[in-house]
Swiss-Prot record:
UniProt subunit comment: Homododecamer.
Matches recorded under PANTHER family: CATABOLIC 3-DEHYDROQUINASE (PTHR21272:SF3)
Name used for this protein in its record: 3-dehydroquinate dehydratase
Entry EC number(s): 4.2.1.10
Source species taxonomy: Bacteria, Pseudomonadati, Campylobacterota, Epsilonproteobacteria, Campylobacterales
Length: 160
């Protein structure tokens, strides 16, 4: 199983920006923890970060046919990007949205979430540990999909 982790704008500044909200852990440290868990779980994982909406859309589209699932923190684009929402919907892959802070307890404009309705699940407010939870959740989602597909194969009429 292969998972793409897509990080949105300003996440490259983790550990520097607003530590009272996002903590002191750098993005590279989060990715190192995810890489370790992926290795223990037999997952292939790739990472992508961009501050540019179009590059994020391109990366989501590149995931089609290449990965089994997406973990995304669209950051500020969560609240504004119909393009990212449409890209997630278009590729139709299991997608888990992650936010380090609890966006529902922050500024009013952050309560608008454009992408959650097209994601399989959302994990918010657990700090960097949310990425670990997203990976555990993604493994569960992918295993359930695999089990359903295997059951459907067994139930399909045998060709004569």
């Amino acid at each position: 199983m292969k998972i793409a982790v897509i990080q949105g704008p300003n996440l490259n500044m983790l550990g520097v920006r607003e530590q009272q909200i996002y903590g002191s852990m750098k993005l590279e440290q989060i990715h190192a923890q995810m890489r370790d868990f992926a290795a223990q779980s037999g997952l292939e994982i790739e990472f992508f970060q961009s501050n540019l909406e179009g590059e994020i859309v391109d990366k989501i589209q590149e995931c089609y046919g290449d990965v089994n699932g997406i973990i995304i923190n669209a950051a500020a684009y969560t609240h504004t990007s119909i393009a990212i929402r449409d890209a997630i919907s278009a590729v139709n892959l299991p997608t888990v949205e992650v936010h380090i802070s609890n966006i529902n307890r922050r500024e009013e404009f952050r309560k608008q979430n454009m992408i959650a309705p097209v994601c399989t699940s959302s994990i918010v407010g657990f700090g960097p540990f949310g990425y670990h939870l997203a990976m555990v959740g993604m493994i569960q989602i992918l295993n359930e999909i695999k089990a359903v597909q295997e059951m459907q194969k067994q139930q399909a009429p045998q060709a004569e």
